[in-house]
Amino acid sequence: MKILIFIIASFMLIGVECKEGYPMGRDGCKISCVINNNFCKVECQAKWRQSDGYCYFWGLSCYCTNLPEDAQVWDSSTNKCGG
């Protein structure tokens, strides 16, 4: 019985983390939004079917969750927006 509890606790501690990030438009910039979660959800699901999305208020940009590991998202270190 102790082993079963240990195994279940181990699985709970491991967890499953998915990639998250800002989706990019064709210009390489983040997709803008103003408190419209539904718009962002549609944008995220158009690129990645199983993802979810919401409008990140402080950044005024869409933010996607539950992305596949190979998803290309906006990154400040490789930002090519506007150039």
From Swiss-Prot:
Post-translational changes noted in the entry: Contains 4 disulfide bonds.
UniProt keywords, alphabetically: Disulfide bond, Ion channel impairing toxin, Neurotoxin, Secreted, Signal, Toxin, Voltage-gated sodium channel impairing toxin
GO annotation terms (biological process): defense response; envenomation resulting in modulation of voltage-gated potassium channel activity in another organism; envenomation resulting in modulation of voltage-gated sodium channel activity in another organism
Residues of the LCN-type CS-alpha/beta domain: 19-82
Domain of life: Eukaryota
Positions of disulphide bridges: 29-81, 33-55, 40-62, 44-64
Tissue: Expressed by the venom gland.
GO molecular function: potassium channel regulator activity; sodium channel inhibitor activity; sodium channel regulator activity; toxin activity
InterPro entries to which the protein is assigned, alphabetical: LCN-type_CS_alpha_beta_dom, Scorpion_toxin-like, Scorpion_toxin-like_sf, Scorpion_toxinL, Scorpion_toxinL/defensin
Family: Belongs to the long (4 C-C) scorpion toxin superfamily. Sodium channel inhibitor family. Beta subfamily.
This protein's domain notes: Has the structural arrangement of an alpha-helix connected to antiparallel beta-sheets by disulfide bonds (CS-alpha/beta).
Identification of the protein by name: Putative beta-neurotoxin RjAa12f
Source organism per UniProt: Rhopalurus junceus (Caribbean blue scorpion)
